[in-house]
């Protein structure tokens, strides 16, 4: 199995995740492993798997995507997998969970307002901790621009 022996169960605004730190790129999960771990009856159970790693260790990223992480000062990458094992571009609740996880692992600042730049398949996201609400964390996640469409009758 290409998953470390120790993982963390994380929750964020109604979603639950399995998270782990992979600082040297040794633990890239297979789709089957993700499905097994996320299975609510036979595994740990989760909406998805969050692997915190360096952008250069994510096999499906192009050189341009890795360069975009470098340009955006994102030392860390959220390699998010859906519970069915498929790759996901982004998950807002996942960014919340992985940021607190990164703080608890000592790879992100816990200073209130200090930006944590996180690479995702949807680009670099800048998250800012708003201070702890023990035992939970609080943070600000930019949500991008909303799209609205209207039809005329």
Positions of predicted regions on the chain:
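Low-complexity basic/metal-binding stretches
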Residues: 136-146, 151-152
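A glycine-rich beta-to-alpha transition motif near the start of alpha/beta enzyme domains, typified by
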Residues: 1-133, 140
